[in-house]
Amino acid sequence: MIMGVQAQGITQERYSLIPRVLVFPVDEKGQVLLLKGASNKKIWANLWNGPGGHLEAGESIVAGAKRELLEETGLSAGKLIHCGQIVVDTGINPGIIFFVFKAKELSGVVRSSVEGELSWFSQPQALKLKLVEDLYTLLPLVMRHRANEKPFWGHYSYDENDQLVMRFSR
């Protein structure tokens, strides 16, 4: 049976997801490299987050994670560990799905970009920063994730007061 685009049943009415990647570079001392969003950014200005962004058309998830890491930090990863994926139900179509990675065996020279400034932190230090809201929960999950473990599944939604609701499972 032919599985062309028309056979997929894809229409504007169907719920769709925008793919993104989020990468947490971790050095040999166990410190994580975070990015403080530039003050002129539309979203997450002056908040700390992992490097990441949208996939380009035709780009694989892994290629997108490697590209975003290099563009935003100047680093390449010898080892990219898939920690999980999270669907974000924004209440409108499309939603978001982001794929979360831990980057290890790093090479290159750390350099800030137009996205913001970079700095290394221990996990306890990082959790005291002004982080993007979900990182207080997400960062510990990523930091304790091991390469041989199953990735986690996450679902984010917003309640009637526009407050973030997070659920995770394995």
Describe each PLM feature range.
Residues L75-G84, F152:
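A short coil-to-beta-strand element that immediately follows conserved catalytic motifs
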Residues L55-G78, V88-V142, L164-R170:
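Unchanged
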